[in-house]
């Protein structure tokens, strides 16, 4: 099945309570598949096409504030419209999941694949000092697997979590093993597991208030310090990556998502030419595996960062390596996906 379809199937199977979204190419199959599967007749999961991306993210905000597993999906310009709601959720410490199947920009751009939302995703695309957890799948299998993982991390840390995919993975068809069914949590389970949730007044506690607003600067500073401490905890415990053939390599390619899949083929071609090249794939783009990249790059003749953009993750790679090794970037723009041969040529030309 397609990567987008895998998102829909996995959402139902992992006990999601609701999906609120709006169709946009190249991710429309997510909501289309959910509409075809009609989970409201089986698990009770709500599926609603909102009137806009702004409406859908605020529906997610409301559902998540009640302790529900809810998600949305969109593509680059649609996700840009959601940034206010995502910032509100981060500030109010509300867990939710959103999927970005990236397309080229800026602006309306193109419907073709891109990875140009890296900055927006890893720096917090709205206002204020906040981060969202960012998972970058490179296969249809990971599209399915990361739905439940994103929910688990979001609720563990009371923080929004993003699956940052792109049009290649979203439209690509592969075999996939779907996760086993999890039942949706009952109201009593939500009350016990998430005491912060707005589940209605009970006799044994004060009413819960979900908000990101605080007018007293001293109190707001303490809230921000609390968030920063939480982000450090996430950095310490949730870094994920995949390193292949890095130890005995002369050169290192760092890439994520579909660009990493293409880089795998490029490395096969490079090996045939006698070049010893390893691949480092960040799976969490935030928290970023800075220390692990620095260790993998140590002693290499050069590092090539391959992205389908003008050069975004390369800045984090350069910060991680801190000038110890040569770091160059190769990417294609406008929705053009690089060929493996182009990556090999860039490796030889730049390094």
Regions found by a protein language model. Name each.
Residues 263-296:
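Generic long, charged, amphipathic alpha-helical segments
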Residues 307-351:
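Peripheral docking tails and interdomain loops at the edges
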Residues 158-243:
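Conformationally flexible catalytic loops at phosphate/diphosphate-handling active centers
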Residues 29-123, 133-155:
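Thiamine diphosphate
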Residues 1-36:
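N-terminal glycine-rich anion-binding loops that anchor highly charged ligand groups
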